[in-house]
Amino acid sequence: DTIGNNVIRGEYGEVFKDKDSAIVTQNPIAVKLVDKDSLYIHADTLLATGPAENRILTGYYGVRIYKTNLSGVSDSIHVDQKSGLIQLLRYPIGDRESQLLSASDMTKRNPVLWSAKTQMSGDLIHLLTDSTTNAIDSLKIFNNAVVAEQDSLNPHSI
């Protein structure tokens, strides 16, 4: 994708030109230009849909992201090229799981981001990028938000 400066590769993929979509499995990795740097997205499955200027990239299961000053994990990811919204999501917990898991166990499934000495977590994390510069403008954490940072004396939570 030369318009959005995105690349997706993996060991197996299928392209559906009529539907403007592609699916990549078996070690898929997507590379997206963000902040004049590369954001690497790895997942069990990557799905790209829509024309280049409106492309949506969705990653399922075991998502890992990495950029020079930011890294993270989540169950799934949704990247909207047009709006610049990157969502790190937790797979919804079913009724049976909610009965078996403690609140602490459910929180451990939340997406997590690390930047420098800061760890951020919550049920849903939004990274908003400027659609013209691809710079990360803001970060929002929804529900059960935790931001922890370790200083030189002792750890503290914000």
Functional labels for PLM-detected ranges:
Residues 1-158:
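Structural signature for solvent-exposed beta-strand/loop edge elements and short helix-capping sites
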